[in-house]
């Protein structure tokens, strides 16, 4: 069967299942099953060629059925891109989002602007390790301390540390993972008053705002989604309190939050003891993260 027919049929199946980007998802899954790049699929489509062995096409159809049931694309392929990393993901770990790349960039820009050498960085609510592993691989000499509450999720963090260290061997001794409650004052207490920057993407979804997308609602771990209160700010506020003790004078907290929470969290940060606090925007112009100076 020509690849054009394969993609057309697959796109139709995904479209009927309510997938927003059926053709893209079909092409990406075929590339994954056939062990080629997405551009190879596009080229085969352009040239009207065949692609994939019988066995590979069987794998593709199985992946397609999973996607039609609204399983996240990244869980099916087993990995998710984040900045310069390709992170392993699967059921039980939060899939890193593009908007979090903006949060990381804000932190890295601050480190660069202030000429930080060998900065001490903390990633609270580490999940897949996206934030901390990005920092430790992009900022030479940085020491990153990551905290994750779930032992199961921490296994994904360790996997991604192992994979990232293959590309950046020096980071193995610069990344430290603790399985603990990120909001507890006992967690990383030995670092209190010494941290240059805390970059974090805590659970913040309001309990009144259950996600409509099945990929999020039915698959992302609830522990990584909901902020512990009706408006979703309970856990973010506890993270602010913890970060305030961790940071040295002049240190910075960069924390992702819901688009509805900016003003409240800025006010809370100032009331907690931060000298300055403001809201940063993501690439769509929406209020997306707190930037607070100790």
Swiss-Prot record:
A GO molecular-function descriptor: protein-(glutamine-N5) methyltransferase activity
Binding sites annotated in the UniProt record for S-adenosyl-L-methionine: 148, 201
Keywords: Methyltransferase, S-adenosyl-L-methionine, Transferase
GO BP, sorted A to Z: methylation
Keyword Zinc: no
Protein EC: 2.1.1.297
InterPro entries: DNA_methylase_N6_adenine_CS, HemK-like, N5-glutamine_MTase, PrmC_N, RF_methyltr_PrmC, SAM-dependent_MTases_sf
Catalytic activity: L-glutaminyl-[peptide chain release factor] + S-adenosyl-L-methionine = N(5)-methyl-L-glutaminyl-[peptide chain release factor] + S-adenosyl-L-homocysteine + H(+)
Domain of life, source organism: Bacteria
Residues bound to substrate: 201-204
Enzyme class (EC, first level): transferase
Pfam families to which the protein is assigned, alphabetical: Cons_hypoth95, PrmC_N
Family: Belongs to the protein N5-glutamine methyltransferase family. PrmC subfamily.
Function according to Swiss-Prot or TrEMBL: Methylates the class 1 translation termination release factors RF1/PrfA and RF2/PrfB on the glutamine residue of the universally conserved GGQ motif.
NCBIfam families, per the entry: hemK_fam, RF_mod_PrmC
Protein name, UniProt field: Release factor glutamine methyltransferase
